[in-house]
Amino acid sequence: MKKFIAIYILLAAILPAAVFAQVQRSAAFHDKYQLKEVVVLSRHNIRSPLSTNGSALSKMTTHQWTNWSSAASELTLKGGVLETEMGQFFRKWTVSEGLFKENQVPSVDEVNVYANSMQRCIATAAYFSTAFMPVGGLKVNHRYTPSTMDPVFNPVLTKVSDAFKAKAMEQINAMGGKAGLVGLAKSLKESYRNISRTLDYPQSEAYKELGDVKYDDTQITLVKGKEPGMKGTMKNFNSASDAFILQYYEEPDADKAAFGEKLTRDDWTSIAKVKDVYGDVLFTAPIVAANVAHPLLMYMKDELNSKNRKFTFLCGHDSNIASVNAALGVERYSLPNSIEKVTPIGSKVVYEKWIEKATGKEYVGVNLVYQSTDQLQQNAPLDLDHAPQVFPLSFKGLEKNADGLYSFEQINERFEQAVNAYDDIK
């Protein structure tokens, strides 16, 4: 895996950007394969945090958070612009691969755009689909009144027992090594320090109530019908981490985004680490992932096996990407050129189904496509010459062929295993 990534990074440095429509594909590759279908699982783009006056976030700092261009938890104007760029890129890429013709109007069976019924997800899908097929008249499918969580995207626990809780906590604690959750919390010392000084947390109203940072107060709650939950310092500082990340993307002045602090890119990466670890703890323990991702795994499997489908765009949340990847056994990764290392804002897991022309055999390539931190901040236009970041994903226990693809049978079987893992939960 490390060797493959090293080669990929080296090639990225010496080859023109146009080569990287999705992942580096040679002329020989295109002579051998034809793109047949694409299934995308996307995180919504930039939203506003819950940082209004009187909120828990407002009490953690003496400073004033950014005046957002949208209501709390809704897609911002900049988020819409960035998602439009992504849709434009995917349009250029799929046309270049011959999956669609320029300005094609697809049949209802060929393209499926389906969003969770939260405003930020519906809006993200709308911006993407308009740019992806500007004359295609695509409809964003969502099943409930905004803003309501759709059960397909809602990462709630639907099976909870004493045995489940014990196994889940065993797997969660293993993430921190011998020290368990305390070890995980201590790995965030620098992150907490950067957040605390940027917030002026010791002078805040919240500090009077919560006191100093603690490393032994993380409590996990696993309740049927609810998302995995957390209480303690990590939970509180995750809220601040999330808000800072979004403010860093949204606010053109980096010093202003940091409330006047002079933060380096490494400092921002450190701040974002809290959110990455928080997501790992709540959604990536294998038994938890199999539980909360079950409906979405079934839906994605059906889309990959849909006879007439050419393109599927599913818009949800970082918890959806994290849990689906964990349930499928995707190997751990750390993304380059991003302060968010696992599921950056607007990121997309892209399943590409390729047909081997000589045999008709189907193969699948899986990549995580995302805008770099610089691309997000600069509203950088995206096309085949100015592509987003593309990071190839790998699955534990599966081997790619010489062209970097898995057989479709391998991927189908892995989805089947992940779906069946839910039935094994007692």
Predicted segments — roles?
Residues 22-110, 116-312, 316-426:
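Signature for phosphate-centric chemistry
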Residues 1-24:
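Bacterial Sec-dependent N-terminal signal peptides
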